[in-house]
Amino acid sequence: MNNQIFESVDHYISDLLGYEDDALLAATNSLAEAGMPAISVSPNQGKFLQLLAQLCQAKNILELGTLAGYSTIWMARALPKNGRLITLEYDPKHAAVAQKNIDRAGLTSQVQIRTGKAIDILPQLVEEGAGPFDMIFIDADKPPYTEYFQWALRLSRPGTLIVADNVIRDGKVLDENSTEPAVQGARRFNAMLGANTAVDATILQMVGVKEYDGMALAIVK
C-alpha cells in the first residue's frame, strides 16, 4: 500500500464524518494567506480531538500550540456554554490570525489565547491556579515535549486526558542516531511516557493527508 491510498481513505472518511464548516475552512485558508506553515491537524484528527473532549466531558481545556486556531475550534466546540479553552502560541502573528478565526467561529467568550513561550506560560498557569484541566493537547515545538508534559501533569487531576501530537515523525523515531531535534524530542518524550507511572498511556500511529505520524494519549492516574 502507498501514501495515495491512505490519503484517499482519509478524504473518504472526512467527506462522511469530518465536515468542515465555513469557520474551519477559513481557518485552513488563513494559513496560506498569512504565509504560515500548513501544519494544522487534519479534519479527521480535529474531529478525533473533538470526540475525545466530549468523552472527557471537558469543561476546561489547555492547548499548547495554537497556529491559526484550527484544532482550537474543533476542541472548543465540544465545550459546554460555561466551558473554557486556554491556548498558548509563541508567535504574535500566528496568535492574531488565530484570534480572527476564533472570533469568526463565535468562540470569543470561551477561548483565551496566551502569547509567549509555552515553557514560560505554563508555570504562570500553575501559579494562577488555572487548572486542573480536563484535557490538555500538546502540539508545539517538539524538543521540549517532555518538559511540557511534566508541566501538564501539574495542571492535571486524576482522569485528565493528555494528548501529544507528532510523536512518530514519519517513523524516524526508530532511528536512535537521528540528529533532528524534533525526532530527538519525540524519542525522549516517548521513552519518558513509557516509564511514567503517573499515567496510563499509548501511542496511535496515524496515516492520511498528514502523511505518517502518531498521537500519544495519556490518562492521569
UniProtKB/Swiss-Prot annotation:
It holds the Pfam family Methyltransf_3. It catalyses: a catechol + S-adenosyl-L-methionine = a guaiacol + S-adenosyl-L-homocysteine + H(+). It comes from the Bacteria. The metal ion affects the meta and para-regiospecificity of the enzyme as well as the enzyme activity and thermal stability. PANTHER family: CAFFEOYL-COA O-METHYLTRANSFERASE 3-RELATED (PTHR10509:SF14), O-METHYLTRANSFERASE-RELATED (PTHR10509). Undergoes conformational changes upon the binding of S-adenosyl-L-methionine and the metal ion. This is Catechol O-methyltransferase.
